[in-house]
Design a protein with these regions (language model features):
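Predominantly soluble domains enriched in secretory-pathway, periplasmic, or organellar proteins
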Residues: 1-125
């Protein structure tokens, strides 16, 4: 449905999650690719019709995932700026949301302790 910026996967979760970046009509959606089928099995609208959904990330055990949802809201009229939204990784049901003015980035402390694929180790001197 469009280019992705931050795919997320976890050994204990059934899907690879991809966000859709850009300004098109799918920028508010996440897609769930089955690990066995390698096909899009689910699409989830997170941030409303005019919003963006970014940076999906699984929790350490893979039971949940969270995503930054920006709503393009007009806060002067009481509309939300954005949220960090948490979902059950198996049912895809929303568990919780936390208001955040401009949610963007990776919030997982696990990522900082994991190996980044593609980076070469430093050369010893």
């Amino acid at each position: 449905a469009g280019p992705t910026e931050s795919p997320a996967a976890h050994p204990n979760a059934p899907w690879i999650i991809v966000d859709i970046v850009g300004t098109g009509p799918n920028a508010n959606k996440l897609q769930f690719i089955g690990k066995e089928s390698l096909e899009v099995e689910h699409t989830l609208e997170v941030a409303g019709r005019l919003g963006h959904s970014h940076f999906p990330e699984y929790t350490a055990r893979g039971d949940f995932f969270y995503v930054s949802a920006r709503y393009r809201g007009d806060r002067s009229q009481g509309l939300p700026g954005g949220q960090l939204v948490i979902y059950d990784a198996h049912t895809l049901k929303q568990v919780k949301s936390i208001d955040v003015d401009v949610p963007a980035g990776v919030f997982s402390h696990v990522r900082s302790r994991s190996v980044t694929v593609g980076l070469q180790p430093p050369v010893p001197h």
